[in-house]
Amino acid sequence: MQWRGAGLWWPRRRQQQQQQQPPPPAFGPPAAAMVPPSRGVSPGLGGRPTSALLFLCYLNFVPSLGRQTSLTTSVLPRTEQSTTYADFIYFTAFEGSVRNVSEVSVEYLCSQPCVVHLEAVVSSEFRSSIPVYKKRWRNEKHLHTSRTQTVHVKFPSIMVYRDDYLIRHPISVSTVILRAWITHWHSGGGLNVRGEENLLHAVAKNYTLLQTVPPFERPFKDHQVCLEWNMDYLWSLWANRIPQCPLESDAVALLSFPYASSGENTGIVKKLQNFQNRELEATRSQRVDYPMVTISLWLYLLHYCEASLCGILYFVDSNEMYGTPSVFLTEDGSLHIQMHLVKGEDLAVKTKFTIPLKEWCRLDISFNGGQIVVTASIGWDLKSYHNQTISFHEDFYYNDTAGYFIIGGSRYVAGIEGFFGPVKYYRLRSLHPAQVLNPFLEKELAEQIKLYYERCTEVQDIISSYAATVQVGGERRETCDFHNSYLDLKRKYGRAEVCRGLPWEKELRDRHPSLFQSLLQMDLLTVPWNQNDSVLEIGARIFEKAVKRLSGVDGLHQISSAIPFLMDSSCCGYHKASYYLTVFYETGLNGPRDQLQGMLYSLVGGQGSERLSSMNLGYKHYQGVDSYPLDWELSYAYYSNIATKTPLDQHTLQGDQAYVETIRLKDDEILKVQTKEDGDVFMWLKHEATRGNAAAQQRLAQMLFWGQQGVAKNPEAAIEWYAKGALETEDPALIYDYAIVLFKGQGVKKNRRLALELMKKAASKGLHQAVNGLGWYYHKFRKNYAKAAKYWLKAEEMGNPDASYNLGVLYLDGIFPGVPGRNLTLAGEYFHKAAQGGHIEGTLWCSLYYITGNLETFPRDPEKAVVWAKHVAEKNGYLGHVIRKGLNAYLEGLWHEALLYYVLAAETGIEVSQTNLAHICEERPDLAGRYLGVNCVWRYYNFSVFQIDAPSFAYLKMGDLYYYGHQNQSQDLELSVQMYAQAALDGDSQGFFNLAALIEEGAVIPHHILEFLEIDPSLHSSNTSILQELYERCWSLSNEESLSPCSLAWLYLHLRLLWGAVLHSALIYFLGTFLLSVVIAWMVLYLQYISASGSSPAPAWVSADPTSSTPSPAVPPAADASDHDPPMMANGPEPRG
């Protein structure tokens, strides 16, 4: 096999387990002259000892800074020096550094016919002794005479020029050796002899070093070509840029925080990319058939594998096959290590040792070609537990970028039951365990996990012994009572029986007082006999007792007394209690916050596959909050586990489940229609359904089947209404629903014949769900894929998402009629179409494609994979049940219970519960402040705005909190603007109004926010222009028919602008002058009037005779007026003071 790559690479022979074949060595001066005998031969030059010694001599003879040297040595014995001493060779490089053409002067003397050799050898970081120039010539005539010849040594362009549009990858060389030697023609040094053998016959030799030039200090080459203008322009943009290699290492942290593996078919998916560093990437590519990697991971196993294999860490290639390396756990606790061979087969080996249970163990597995070294170390001091070396004579195929790694389970294999600690992966190095750097950073949390299971082992032993003792005693008493009447008389009249004391010391009883109290108060005779089932059943009873205490009127007061019982329930494997403890510790609900204990119980619940615990872990890693690291792949592992259970849970008739509905406590209209079995809405629907109203029958059946709108889940009653509606009405939806129930036998005996008739009847009425149902029938029961595809294509054209998903399944399984083989691309397209229509399984397939990135149409996007899996997981009925209990408590005014259940739901990361909890805390700040150890309003509104589907009012709330500041949170106008802008972008008029109000107060809206709102800052450069745009958008989005605050603000702004325009125009000066003139004239006339009134007590035209009230009609008015000095002012303006 050979190294793969371009350039001056040497062929590499396959390295077997015990034998290594090095690349050909370089050559140098004689070993006898320079190398001490004690050093021996270098291990890397074992292929040709003589040539290796010569190369070492050359290396030892290289001066550290010298450019030229003239040294002549002889390889013949000293007794023969007189015959060969005349032979010599010198040369001078006129330019001490590497150039495209370097002129070299060679001076030599031959005593016999000879051949003169000149050679240039270069070395780089990864390759050495590569000849790049060779020249030789004969000298037969000019003997015993010094000769000088000038040689123009031409080096490759990639060594002497910078990279440009033609020289894409110049080589950075570390050493350039120019060497020359003379061989006699008749002594085995002819032209037909290869260079390596020629050097052995050299009678004189010499060398010099040429100084190398770094790639970015080299000149550009004139290629004598004319570039197109676009190429020339692009070249000018980056011609003088010096790229910098990113800091890159082959060590990859696949996992840094503990992962709770539930032993199911979900795990962490990690995909490695090519190295950006060209040298690292070249090394990785060359080792495709010779892996040198190291895996280091921490494990805490609870149980060995129940199946034949359980996934630990394995590689899945692009063909969905296991690759190299793949590590599994077996049912007896040993390791199963599997490799894929170059020839296409697979090879596996099983370790001779087993992994210990309930101990933190570090596994270090190193691959060095065909050799595998497995080391298991126990505890934090890495006390060696076992070491095993396995050797193969096969070539392993290794390409860590042509697929993805999985930690834990997948759809191919279940994962281990336990916990993963940090996982480190060295891509290019085979390391000894002492060289591996993989510390457990969360050591305190790991210690708590170990202590928890030690305590739980003790609790389970107590419960098992106690239950067994009580049950055996009860069974014996029942048996004796049935068969022996004499004992009846003895118990009645004899001495009372005394129970035998249970074998527990006082110290043990003191450590578990709540457990013994629960056991004494519990009727254990009804507990199942099986040990695991009995422990779980007792845990469930302890939990119900604790929850009953928490559900009282003052339930939050009882949290501290309920915690010991919840701990006992958690130890019994009933992990609903674990989630309660998680929330209590992480939120400080009526107690101090303890993040470490919160993480502990969250991980324990996740390991037990508890739905709400897994969603809590997924959410915390998705957002990176509460000291959980941001890790989308880890978040996906938790969310996908619950998402895959959600469709199964929805079709499970038993269990505390309810439909997840988006009901906001601030929406009074929605709250009014919430009902119960004795509520007005339900009773009215039942009345209408009894009268034969098909719509009422369907709605009533849906409410009872799924547990919607406050009605408890009751599948049996729902099926009765489905049957009544299907058989009595012609409504196609009811007919279809009842047909599905009959097909699946959900709460009723299966009746495939009647179901098919009803399905055909509904399809004939044009119901696309029924058309899809017919396709499902022919696919599942008849295996008639052609007919199934026909119905599904028809239903898909009608817009049915189920049909899109089913068509995708046909392509995925490779059974689509007329299409040979599988077509994953088309399957992915149909799954994506189904997911966009709300299909749960289609969404799950899309999330899987996004996390693996194995389909070209689904580029790897871990964040999008988490979003899609989270969307499905939040439809889980067990979460819906908790939300419904909180809503019912709120409607009934039970504040303690409402707060408890909404905190439990909000910590899973579902947005509607987060905003509802914040609303409760706003309504009852006294309750939140007293019992919650977190800033409730701030925490949950802040959580909600980081959701994908966050409501606009949450952005407005956070904007207000940033604007005013809230409790310990400081004011932040910049973030306030961002929140208001996001609300405005979501179409909320209040967001535009608040932004305008900030501008009115003097705040400045950054340009990127304006561009975010699609407001061009160049067109709206002034605050006035921006205000106009904001108020206009606010008015256009307002839902009020009458005048709204937005319209009034817009009108007021324009009035101000109009008034400002008037004040700044020329007309104002004219009007001002005119009014001033009028006022002055009036003042003068008024003063004249006052002075005239003071000299004459009555006007001249007024008669002194009181009987005369008017002037004489004989006097004309004009003449009458002219006879008096003061003018008549009866019609003048009234004075205004």
Curated annotation (Swiss-Prot):
Low complexity compositional bias, start-end: 1102-1120
Highest taxon in the source lineage: Eukaryota
SMART domains cross-referenced by the UniProt entry: SEL1
Residues that carry a glycan: 206, 387, 942
GO cellular component: membrane
Residue ranges of Sel1-like repeats: 575-609, 611-647, 694-730, 732-767, 768-800, 801-839, 840-877, 952-988
InterPro entries associated with the record: Sel-1L3 (IPR042756), Sel1-like (IPR006597), TPR-like_helical_dom_sf (IPR011990)
Region annotation Disordered: where it falls in the sequence: 1-42, 1100-1137
Main localisation: membrane
Keywords per UniProt: Glycoprotein, Membrane, Phosphoprotein, Repeat, Transmembrane, Transmembrane helix
Pfam families, A to Z: Sel1 (PF08238)
Cross-referenced PANTHER family: PROTEIN SEL-1 HOMOLOG 3 (PTHR44444:SF1)
Identification of the protein by name: Protein sel-1 homolog 3
Gene: Sel1l3
